Design a protein with these regions (language model features):
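Structural preference for long, well-ordered alpha-helical segments in enzyme cores
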Residues: 43-44
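Cytosolic regulatory/linker segments at or just downstream of nucleotide-handling modules
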Residues: 21, 52-125, 130, 136-137, ...
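Catalytic core of nucleotidyl cyclases, primarily class III adenylyl/guanylyl cyclases
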Residues: 1-39, 63, 69, 88-93
């Protein structure tokens, strides 16, 4: 999609996570509905909504990647940081799986992957000035990288305010 005739501009997004889920049927005699309830499905749904903001079509959790043998060598992945899970206060690593992107997107993500991930690591370590420099370099090669733009914005915001304590994550869920 997005490249097929009649689907220009359509950019589907997918969020993938791993965990237990409870399935059931709810409703009344007049109307029944199937429901999936779990933190896993809620996080996957959150990632799906988050994907376009970061130039991603497929966002996956580190928890899912741990379940797939050789995932890091089988797929084109770019670490985009952590999501802070408010229910547990844990940090979940999030990856952009760019195998589903256009050839042009795959090329610039592969080309800037090392610099981008270094910038993310610096941001997580609260080295905002150094992280900012990395994201500027990424944007010189790929100005359309929304994730790098978002991190640049976050670095600027952090540099222009007093340190508010440990952040180390991209977004809170």
């Amino acid at each position: 999609l997005g490249e097929e005739p009649g689907f220009e501009g359509v950019r589907p997004a997918i969020g993938l996570n791993y965990g237990s889920t409870k399935l059931g049927i709810i409703g009344t005699d007049e109307r029944l509905e199937a429901v999936a309830i779990s933190e896993s499905t809620n996080l996957a749904q959150f990632l799906q909504k988050m994907a376009p903001k970061y130039s991603a079509r497929i966002l996956v959790t580190g928890t899912l990647l741990e379940q797939i043998p050789d995932a890091r060598s089988r797929y084109h992945l770019r670490w985009i940081g952590f999501v802070s899970l408010s229910a547990t206060e844990a940090l979940e690593p999030i990856y952009d799986c760019f195998d589903g992107d256009t050839p042009e997107e795959r090329a610039w993500k592969a080309e800037t992957k090392e610099q981008f991930e270094r910038g993310v690591a610096l941001y997580c370590a609260r080295s905002y000035y150094e992280a900012r420099k990395m994201f500027i370099e990424v944007l010189k090669s790929s100005y359309q990288d929304f994730a790098a733009k978002e991190y640049l914005f976050l670095c600027d915001r952090r540099l222009n305010q007093e340190d508010t304590g440990a952040q180390g994550y991209l977004v809170r869920y």
